[in-house]
Amino acid sequence: MIQRLLTHIAWPVRVLWIAFALAPNGFGVVAWILWAVVAIGTWIHHPISLTTIRCLAPIVVFYSVVYALSESLSSLNIAVVTCGIISLMLMFTADYGSAHVQAGAYGNERRFLLRIPAPVVLPTLITWALFATVLVVLENAVQSENYVLGIPLLLALIAMSWKFAPQMHRLSKRWLVRVPAGWVVHDDLLLAENLLVRSHNLVAIDFALAESDALDLSGMTRGVPIQISLREMTDVRLSQLGARLLKTMDVLHVQAFLVATTRTPLN
């Protein structure tokens, strides 16, 4: 049953997210706008939608939980909050992320979303927390009609979105891609340019061993990485961040490298 749910995961997310808004929830103008943007994103599968959903949905659910705790905990309030929390949990599953990134694929591409590098997790959470705080305070300012505070917050929110939204979206554009010509690592966070492995140069693709000496492009994230072994040496051009994390030069010649996907490409 669980596997069947994940196979058609888009519909449970949509239904639960709509049910989440059907009962009294204390939403103001800002919260309703955020809810609507997320709702639209659940119907339009795309990497941009994935970024939008995963950034905004937690804020809406948090606001609903706070409202429910401040009111009498009726069975209806508990049911509504539960719908929101379950929907949010499904939005952060590997299957849901894969559905969005695959929807933007070209032709015969098969995209496998990469896990977020461990050193980037904390800065990402801090950035999101600042963004979420501004949104929550803006919601309270609008509800209390405190426009003296609300207008500067709105301007700050626009500036933060302009600055940080592209950085957050980069995490939804990191893929291992299977194409007719072979495999491509599309990761502008750790790589300066895409890494193409043609089929004739591929020796093996399998789970990495613990003592593997392959170049680690997984970003030291959790889980067992995938090792891609090559017949001939190939150039890997690292971004400034990638070179800094690996403590090496920005151009390397390698015969094997590691990546960490949210779903295995070995099936």
Model-derived segments and their meaning:
Residues 183-185, 194-212:
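Phosphoinositide-dependent membrane-docking surfaces
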Residues 173-188, 195:
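Polybasic phosphoinositide-binding surfaces of eukaryotic membrane-targeting domains
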Residues 1-73:
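Membrane-anchoring hydrophobic segments
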Residues 1-8, 42, 74-134:
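N-terminal membrane-targeting/pre-transmembrane regions
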Residues 62-69, 90, 229-267:
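Terminal and domain-flanking low-complexity segments
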Residues 103-177:
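Anionic N-terminal interaction surfaces
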Residues 29-37, 77-87, 149-158:
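Hydrophobic core segments of alpha-helical transmembrane domains in multi-pass membrane proteins
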Residues 213-238:
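Short, surface-exposed polybasic-and-hydrophobic patches located at secondary-structure transitions
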